[in-house]
């Protein structure tokens, strides 16, 4: 049986269905059956598909971008869920131009939705990878992020 984690379902979908410019039909019955046959429970599958659906929708919403010299201040709630290492990681990705203000906010929002998973840098890397994958204008940033994530997972996902 698979670890009952929304993140594990998302990682499986990314590795097996979302790379190579494949489109993922979130409503496809065959996909649901396949995930259940792999041992994922239906409630976890539904949560993962809902998370992906939300990501697809939120990426289209217009966002007022901050001023060029502005600085992102994390709320108390965000600080409770994103420790110092996570916040430093996000800032570093933005400084390296892997994230821009829009994609940074998408990553934060999507990570907070997975807060029950326990947010750490490893989770943030995967969330960032999936956010960038869903942003067609972020191909270069996606390539950089893929290298970062895949370098860390040579020995496997834990």
Swiss-Prot record:
Top-level taxonomic group: Bacteria
Pfam families: DUF494
Entry-linked InterPro entries: Smg
Family indicated by similarity: Belongs to the Smg family.
Protein name in UniProt: Protein Smg homolog
Upper taxonomic lineage: Bacteria, Pseudomonadati, Pseudomonadota, Gammaproteobacteria, Legionellales
């Amino acid at each position: 049986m698979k670890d009952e984690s929304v993140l594990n379902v998302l990682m499986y979908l990314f590795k097996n269905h979302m790379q190579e410019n494949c489109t993922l039909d979130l409503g496809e019955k065959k996909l649901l059956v396949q995930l259940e046959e792999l041992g994922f429970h239906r409630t976890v599958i539904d949560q993962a598909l809902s998370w992906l659906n939300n990501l697809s929708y939120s990426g289209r919403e217009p966002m007022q971008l901050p001023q060029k010299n502005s600085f992102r201040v994390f709320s108390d709630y965000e600080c409770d869920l994103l420790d110092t290492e996570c916040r430093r990681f996000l800032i570093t990705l933005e400084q390296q131009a892997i994230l821009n203000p829009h994609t940074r906010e998408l990553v934060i929002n999507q990570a907070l939705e997975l807060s029950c998973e326990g947010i750490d840098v490893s989770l943030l890397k995967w969330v960032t990878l999936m956010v960038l994958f869903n942003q067609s204008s972020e191909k270069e940033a996606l390539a950089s992020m893929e290298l970062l994530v895949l370098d860390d997972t040579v020995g496997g996902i834990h």
